[in-house]
Each structure stands twice: as structure tokens, then as C-alpha cells.
């Protein structure tokens, strides 16, 4: 599956901004069929960063991925690249 089909778009909510600042995480809407390994690989290839952990949440047919980045890759820098900040 293509990286751009796996990662649909980043989420910019109050909770996602709080997670970005406190836990070095970004939240993405992802394809419902994508698993954690696929999401991790797609994010690492798209943004050239190291991902520590991926948690997923499925609700009402939509899937969110909570991606935690390594300390050397601040989530705020990635959010700035995406235009979220």
C-alpha cells in the first residue's frame, strides 16, 4: 500500500496539540486496513524521522494513529513542516 494512502491527514485538535507538546506525539487519520507496522514505516519514510511507538484507535469506521517520535525528532518540528503550527 502507498504511504499516502496509509496516512490520510494529520489531526489538529486541542488534544492532539496537547499530546504534541507534552508527549512528543502526532495524531494522524489513517486507512482502516493499515496496521501498526505499516503506519510506522509510512511515517518514517514520509518525514525521514524515527518512530518509537504507534497506538491506534478505531471508532465509527475511522482509524486514528497516535505516533510517538524519538527524542531527536520533536513532534513540533514535524507539525511545522505539515503547517499545523
Language model segments and positions:
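Contiguous, often N-terminal, cationic amphipathic patches that form binding interfaces
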Residues: 1-85
Amino acid at each position: 500500500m502507498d504511504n499516502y494512502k496509509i496516512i490520510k491527514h494529520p489531526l489538529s485538535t486541542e488534544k492532539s496539540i496537547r499530546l504534541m507538546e507534552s508527549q512528543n506525539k502526532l495524531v494522524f487519520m489513517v486507512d482502516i486496513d493499515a496496521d501498526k507496522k505499516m503506519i510506522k514505516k509510512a511515517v518514517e519514510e514520509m518525514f525521514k524521522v524515527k518512530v518509537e511507538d504507534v497506538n491506534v484507535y478505531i471508532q465509527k469506521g475511522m482509524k486514528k494513529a497516535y505516533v510517538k517520535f524519538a527524542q531527536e525528532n520533536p513532534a513540533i518540528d514535524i507539525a511545522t513542516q505539515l503547517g499545523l503550527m
